[in-house]
Amino acid sequence: MSEHSVPQIDGPRHEPAGGGPAEQLIVLLHGLGADGNDLIQLAPMLARAFPEAAFVSPHAHQDCDVAPVGLQWFSFKGESDQVMIQGAEQAAPVVDTFLDQELERQGLTADKLAVVGFSQGGMMALHCGLRRAQPPACLVGFSTLLPGPEKLDAEIKSKPPVLLTHGDQDQIIPAHAMPQTEAALKAAGVPAESETRPGLGHGIDERCLELASDFLSRHLAG
């Protein structure tokens, strides 16, 4: 995918409360079958700790091919490990270009960037965030996994701290994916922490948001 052929994406925004320049950039990547309007709903809650942050939740660039509505970062047809890593690799230029453009738009450096993703969006947050030449401040993955963990050692460029949360009743991405992802991250030298949420399915609950807010507060520079 050449630079000129990379699809341009955008989505809903939540601007800094004070109306001035953003002090941080928090990018929210939605899951399969949703769009940016889904995760931008997290912005008002996270903005309590980051009133001067700019939030943006871009719409993925592909129509979902396994549901009648919504979007996808890549096709999940086949649901194999190979499908996931190839899909993440193909979508990475779209996400990386967007992150670069948003940092430039806000006049911010990478250490003021956090990438937060749910499910397939979390896969993209991890895949891209660990391969960026300029490391983001941190990454958050809700109900997700790391595509192609066996490729990480050879391709990793950044080691930002990572938070993972996962419901133990998740029927979409099994809960055992989280400790596997955490182990792969730590083996590559990435600081990672996690919490399993009892009774939670494939989703984000209030505790997940509390954990994310605390994690971002510790790692995202003001």
Set out the residue ranges of the language-model regions.
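A conserved short beta-strand
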Residues: 134-146
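Short beta-strand/loop motif that positions the catalytic acidic residue
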Residues: 164-166, 170
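Short beta-strand immediately N-terminal to the catalytic nucleophile in serine-hydrolase-like folds
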Residues: 115-117, 142
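Gly/Ala-rich beta-loop-alpha elbow adjacent to hydrolase catalytic centers
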Residues: 117-121, 125
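Serine-hydrolase catalytic machinery in alpha/beta-hydrolase-like enzymes
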Residues: 2-108, 112
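C-terminal catalytic histidine-bearing segment of alpha/beta-hydrolase fold enzymes
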Residues: 179-222
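Hydrolases whose catalytic domains are alpha/beta-hydrolase-1, hotdog thioesterase
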Residues: 124-128, 150
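Conserved alpha/beta-hydrolase "acid-adjacent" motif
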Residues: 171-177
